[in-house]
Amino acid sequence: MNAYFSYEADWLKQRNAWHTAAEIWQQPDLWAALHRQLQDQQAQWQPFLAPLLANPRLQIVLCGAGSSAFAGRALAPWLRERTGRDVAAYGTTDIVANPRQYLDPERPTLLVSFARSGNSPESVATVELADQLLPESYHLMLVCNPDSRLAQYAHQRGNVCSLVMPQGSNDQSFAMTSSFSCMMLSAALLLGPASLEAAQAPLNAMVQRCRTLRETLQPQVKALAASGFRRYITLGGSCFTGLAEEASL
């Protein structure tokens, strides 16, 4: 089996770190696969999203639980700045506790659900509440589990577009890595200002850069891990707030 970050497979497995290392390592490859997949699925999502995004009254709500909520918090400021659209990010636990505080029945709403498992009760309940309370509710579901309740919800409704992230993104480790970055990237590509074609060159550059960094940064990361620190603090503002929250896990 493959070695990751210069650690052999047996060493990683003995320390229950195999999945985590593999899922961190594979991310640039999955990003490239995600772009190809979205191109192949354009006939599925473009007719759904295009008329919604053309509506100046549209409110976009990015939501999820835990790390999935952090993905929305990281992306919302960037989308607001780059597109001029009304974009907010809320945790599904907050929406479920007081939906009328976050969902505006006076405006058409696109609820973007980030979900690794797609089965968490609060994520499913948020979708159901939106359909109950909003006259114009639409759902873009970005999930990693094709058999999840959220993924299946799209088969029952006409106001839903469900996209499953590339195979391998449904992380097996406790921490979300590939799932987090793939869902966040897919939302940026689908809702951002650039077309898929225009985004391809910068995405390819990012993929190649990260493939290089996962090799070249190993000595610095290992030295930092061996330095004996007892506390790890992440800082960030605006887009980096959600990333800092996720990194602290």
Question: Each predicted region: which residue ranges?
Answer:
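N-terminal amphipathic/basic leader segments beginning at the initiator methionine
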Residues: M1-L30
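A short, structure-level motif marking secondary-structure boundaries and short turns
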Residues: F5-S6, I60-L62, L111, R231-I233
